A protein has these predicted regions:
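N-terminal, active-site-proximal structural segment of metallo-dependent hydrolase catalytic domains
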Residues: 2-139, 145-146, 150-156, 273, ...
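Acidic carboxylate-rich catalytic motifs and surrounding loops in phosphoryl-/glycosyl-chemistry enzymes
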Residues: 125, 173-174, 280-292, 332-336
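Conserved beta strand-loop-helix elements of the APE1-like EEP
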Residues: 153-169, 306-327
Length: 355
């Protein structure tokens, strides 16, 4: 580091600390699994340097406590977890952005995995460069698949573990202009009754510098889902989709309309996928949008006491076709109490019958 810090450097550091969730900033002061994501205030796209300092939330007006009665505010993973088993004849799937497996393993990863006992485990942002041995019991999960970032080591990455072996596996996003760069972002498993897609959608980045790239992804994602739908099987699309679809999906919508994950472009892109492929957000379909449904989020920044204050974003989803939602979805929930091994909490889907 240079001995003298320029005003531009200082401004950029402030922006980085206050921006909602910049997934790919190199920050040597943070341990693997930490994040520069922060629920703060609005930022504008950076077109020229130096970056402008975002407006601060007026002192005294920021959130103090969760808006949901009974919301969990623990900042470490509970040492003992008792989670419901899947009903007889049902399959349980869990999806979790672990924000760095090496860190998550030290903070309760296996406590959650053991307690949930899901039939399928979908992980995102594992940040490792090769498969980790004994992460799960291979006798329980005989099928495993790992996807790694093409050009950046220790970045992104997806993995899936399943108690039943799928018929086929398609790594990456075949409809993307550069499919090779997507293998650390998505995998599609074909089962007898459905296609399961485990996905870590790229976000638009600090200052929305990658918003156009994100829009390319959304178009390619829609095309891939349409191709799968044409094959006549159900669709289950899950993962960190890096979008808050509606204002109810984050604590401070009015101050984040220019923040990655809540721009009108990203929300419209997600709406287009749901509408044109005829899919539904299972959690919102189940919970509704009334006051009683507010305050349920899947991501809380490690910074600024966001977890304790209930300042969160709902970025993690299970999306299905409408027929599956109507006839087979039993439960779609956020495991709010399972926080501490990541800045995200797991989301869970239970469906009737086999995959």
């Amino acid at each position: 580091m240079a001995a003298t810090e320029t005003s531009t450097d200082a401004s950029n550091k402030r922006l980085k600390a206050r921006h909602d969730y910049n997934e790919d900033q190199d920050d040597n002061d943070l341990e693997d699994g930490d994040s520069a994501k922060a629920e703060a205030t609005t930022t504008k796209p950076i077109k020229t340097a130096p970056a402008k300092k975002p407006a601060l939330v007026k002192k005294g007006s920021e959130a103090k406590t969760p808006i949901r009665t009974g919301a969990h505010t623990n900042t470490v993973m509970p040492t003992k977890l008792s989670l419901p088993k899947a009903p007889e004849g049902c399959v349980k799937l869990t999806s979790w952005n672990v924000s760095g497996l090496n860190a998550s393993l030290k903070k309760g990863f296996k406590t959650y995995i053991s307690a949930e006992d899901a039939d399928v485990i979908c992980l995102q942002e594992h940040k490792v460069n090769q498969p980790l041995l004994n992460l799960v019991d291979p006798k329980v999960y005989p099928f495993s698949w790992w996807g790694f970032e093409k050009d950046k080591k220790g970045y992104a990455g997806v993995a899936i573990f399943s108690k039943t072996t799928p018929l086929n596996v398609t790594p990456g996003l075949p409809t993307h202009p550069d499919p090779g760069c997507t293998k650390g972002r998505i995998v599609t498993l074909e089962y007898p009754t459905c296609f399961l897609l485990g996905c870590y959608v790229p976000n638009a980045g600090q200052g929305l510098v990658r918003l156009k790239e994100r829009m390319v992804w959304d178009v390619a994602m829609k095309e891939w889902l349409l191709q799968l739908k044409a094959k006549g099987k159900h669709i289950i699309w899950t993962g960190d989709l890096n979008v808050c679809h509606k204002p109810i999906d984050l604590r401070n919508p009015t101050t984040n309309t220019m923040s990655a994950g809540f721009t009108k472009e990203e929300r419209a892109g997600f709406s287009a996928i749901l509408d044109e492929v005829d899919l539904v957000d299972t959690f919102r379909e189940t919970q509704g949008e009334g006051p009683e449904a507010a305050g349920q989020y899947s991501y809380f920044s490690y910074r600024f006491q966001c977890r304790v204050k209930g300042i969160g974003w709902r970025l993690d989803y299970f999306v299905t076709d409408k027929e599956l939602q109507k006839e087979r979805v039993v439960e779609s929930v956020i495991r709010d109490e399972c926080y501490g091994a990541s800045d995200h909490v797991p989301v869970v889907l239970v469906v009737k019958g086999a995959l």
